[in-house]
From Swiss-Prot:
It is found in: Periplasm. It holds the Pfam family Cytochrom_C552. Its cofactor is Ca(2+); heme c. It comes from Desulfotalea psychrophila (strain LSv54 / DSM 12343). Residues 1-23 form the signal peptide. It catalyses: 6 Fe(III)-[cytochrome c] + NH4(+) + 2 H2O = 6 Fe(II)-[cytochrome c] + nitrite + 8 H(+). It comes from the Bacteria. Disulfide bonds: none annotated. Heme c 2 binds at residues 169, 172-173, 313. Residues 494-508 have a biased composition (Polar residues). This is Cytochrome c-552. Heme c 4 binds at residues 295, 298-299, 405. One of its GO terms (molecular function) is calcium ion binding. The lineage of its organism: Bacteria, Pseudomonadati, Thermodesulfobacteriota, Desulfobulbia, Desulfobulbales.
Amino acid sequence: MNKSYKILLTGSVIAIGAMGLMANSINSREAERKEINTGPVVQAEGVASKNEEWYRYYPREYDSWKQTKKSDKITDLLREKPQLAIIWAGYGFAKDYNAPRGHFYAIQDNINTLRTGAPTGPSNGPMPTACWTCKSPDVPRLMDEVGENEFFTGKWAKYGNQIVNPIGCADCHNSQTGNLGFSRPHLGRALEASGVNLDEITFQDMRTLVCAQCHVEYYFRPTEWTDKTGKTKTAKVVTLPWAKGLSAENMEEYYDEYSFKDWTHKISKAPMLKAQHPGYELFSKGIHAQNGVSCADCHMPYKQQGSIKYTDHNIGNPLDDIASTCLTCHRDSEKAFRDRVASKLERKEQLMKMAMDTLAAAHLEAGKAWELGATEAEMQPVLELLRSGQWLWDYSIASHGSFFHSPEETLRLLGVANDKGGKARIKLAAILAQHGLIGYQVPDFSTKEKAQALAGVPLQKLITEKKAFESTLLEQWNEEAVKAGRLDPKTLEGMSNKSSWSQTELSQ
């Protein structure tokens, strides 16, 4: 009996000890969880724009964010879809347009693209400061320091030595609390203009709306203001055209009311609109949004590390981690689900190509009509169809994921776009016939080189100028940013440097 008692006592002591160790481990992990999720003060005031400053409190999120570095492939969409160079003739996208890469490359891609030109100083170049708006947490830092209107005044090169950290923590999180928040004022204004009560926004809403700060349609609205010295200036303020609603037709009506145009088409002379990336607007019309699914649910799934649950910040294609994203709700096999997505993409690609071929041919036919002496009165109905049809086409595909976020709306828009382009071509055939030309065959635009030549893009000149810029002013920007403590050069280690035009040179 005594022996049994001793065995029981020993076992009890061991069990109690094990339970104590387990409790200590659980308490330790619980304390860690609370520390990470309490929302520590990363910076007492202002905006903590250097992403590495957030690592201390959010190591898992930061390490996963750095994985966006792996998404470094350059896909030259002008080479894959040469119709684009015709469709955008006279606009920057005819020079250079690539598929999106990881957030880690946001600054590099903005600098490398031929669209931003080759400035030689802070006050020249083709683009305004607004072209930095969605590329860096340095943007809200600067808005906080100099004011929104001052930020939006001047040329892109004005802030080359200031905006140096790629899309990261402070773009979506408040530096004082760590909570999700709007770092770009244009979104709050647009939501209110569209009838949203900002006080009623939920945490789940925010898991989409922080993305909507940038994945939206916008334009640069000229805004006069007076600085502290009394000088009148004009800012090009990022504005979301949501006052009439979030559909493509609502925004077209908004732009028409202001007689707004992004550019005049170089070939057809049509007053054109360029859709940016209306991902949020199209997503809001899809089945996922209607069922309360957020962007983060699919693109930033929760991960588990021990007792710690955190959000994966390796933002990318949900199909790359399908077990943690799509298949948590959809009960298909992985193959069946991938096949379903591929089918949606195939249908979109088919209708998109039809619309692009139609619109590109219509622009070239319009150019020929002008060449033969067509009048403004003859061409006006054609130009209206081209403006509207191309807007609907661009709106439907510019956000890249629209075929999945809102497949029905995407296909509807492509169908209407193709119809309007076709109607423009019918009218143009009649105009050309009236001016003595029947059966006109448009020039071949089947390759990037042929299409850019027709669009008047001096590609080699643009590349030469960009290379000169990168070996002079860009190096100066980086040196100044490092010296001022705005950029830690260690964050650039192991980073590839790619562009579509450097790949073009290598292939020649």
